[in-house]
Amino acid sequence: MAPQDHASALRPAVGGWAELPFFETHWPRIEAALAQETRQILPPAHQRFAALERTPPESTRVVILGQDPYPTPGHAHGLSFSVEPDVTPLPRSLRNIYQEMRDDLGTCPETGDLRPWAAQGVLLLNTVLSVPAGEANGHKSLGWQELAHQVLDLSSRRPTAYVLWGNQAQKLESHIRPGDHLIVKTAHPSPLSARRGFFGSRVFSAINDWLTARGEPPITWADPRPAQGSIFDV
């Protein structure tokens, strides 16, 4: 097999994102490091690139950046902030996201599974795509961040809404090309900072207002029925 063919064979099946240089320059080294790990790695390998698989570049309308996957087994499945539908109680950041959505729109999803957002063009991308179980930020030095940089560069070749929650996400704004974008910057929804500018930001209605002004369909963030609050009571 020629070197170029071998590099192509190593690339995950992530549609148009597979053409990013990251998969030739960085992924082989990261993959080798993961293969040497003795700790449990989250999410499972088949879900590691789920965000890119579910929201290809041509469908991406909104990008919500996260940090790294939840380090609790059974929670992370490859989309930032999202958890499997049977997870209760919700992680605290996601709980705050839903509280803000309920205040903004009067409703929120019934579970923590955000796959329906991804299907509508919301790219839920962590800047680091793996984590050792129980060790938040345990893989921050593997080089994953280069993928996020390249995704931002490619996605910003056309108007896109970017949600940058917290200082770490906001540092990546420099990788967004100038353009007719919506860039929302607030405090992170974590309990430590949510009251310093995240609550009251009305980010979900702001994104939909921007999309509809461009003649695009809004994101259905949740069932239009009013939230009953059950996910907040567990």
Swiss-Prot record:
HAMAP family: UDG. The keyword Membrane does not apply. Belongs to the uracil-DNA glycosylase (UDG) superfamily. UNG family. It catalyses: Hydrolyzes single-stranded DNA or mismatched double-stranded DNA and polynucleotides, releasing free uracil. Its main location: cytoplasm. This is Uracil-DNA glycosylase. It comes from the Bacteria. GO terms for molecular function: uracil DNA N-glycosylase activity. One of its GO terms (cellular component) is cytoplasm. Its EC number is 3.2.2.27. Keywords: Cytoplasm, DNA damage, DNA repair, Hydrolase. The keyword DNA repair applies. SMART domains: UDG, UreE_C. It is found in: Cytoplasm.
